[in-house]
Regions:
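Glycosyltransferase catalytic domains, chiefly GT-A lineage
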Residues: 1-158
Length: 158
C-alpha cells in the first residue's frame, strides 16, 4: 500500500474536457492523493495534466493507463477501483463531473471493511421499480467481494 487514503477518477476522450476543472477544484480543497485512470484520454490531455503545477500531494504517477482493459468508458470504472484497492487502505472513486466545493476527506470515516459505500439512485429506482445505486461517488476499504463480482460481470458483458 502506498497511502492510507486515495481519491481516484477516470475518463476517456469524450469526458476528459471536465478533468482540468475537476482537478483544480479538488486540489483547491484537498491534500489527499488523487490518481486518474486513463480510459482512453488524448495525448494532449495527458500532457496538459502532467504539466499542472505539482503540489505536496502530487505523485509522479498520477495518470494510470487502462489500455489493457477491453471494456469502454464507464465500464472500466470497476476495474480501476479494483486496481486502486491495492494502492491504499481506503479508496474513493469520484466522477469528474462532481463539483468539489470543500475538503471531502471525511468521506473515509464512513467506510466499512470489505463493503462499497454508495447511495441509492432514487430517480432510477422510482423509474424501474428495482433498487439502483449511484456510482458517481463510491468509497470502500480493502477489496470488497462485491467489487470483484462487479468488475468480472462487466468484463463478461463488454
Amino acid at each position: 500500500m502506498t497511502s492510507s487514503n486515495l481519491f481516484i477518477t477516470g475518463c476517456d476522450k469524450t469526458t476528459e474536457w471536465m478533468l482540468p476543472w475537476f482537478i483544480h477544484n479538488f486540489k483547491k480543497h484537498n491534500t489527499t492523493p488523487l490518481k486518474i485512470f486513463d480510459f482512453g484520454m488524448t495525448n494532449d490531455m495527458k500532457t496538459q495534466i502532467r504539466s499542472l503545477p505539482k503540489s505536496s500531494h502530487s505523485d509522479r504517477r498520477m495518470i494510470i493507463s487502462m489500455k489493457d482493459v477491453q471494456s469502454k468508458g464507464w465500464y472500466k470504472k470497476p476495474e480501476a477501483m479494483f486496481r486502486a484497492s491495492g494502492m491504499a487502505e481506503k479508496v474513493c472513486w469520484i466522477d469528474t463531473d462532481c463539483h468539489v466545493l470543500d475538503n471531502i476527506d471525511d468521506i473515509f470515516d464512513y467506510t466499512e471493511p470489505q463493503k462499497l459505500g454508495m447511495v441509492e439512485d432514487k430517480p432510477w429506482t422510482m423509474r424501474t421499480g428495482g433498487k439502483f445505486h449511484n456510482s458517481g461517488v463510491v468509497v470502500f476499504e480493502g477489496t470488497p467481494p462485491i467489487l470483484d463480482q462487479w468488475r468480472k460481470k462487466v468484463a463478461e458483458k463488454n
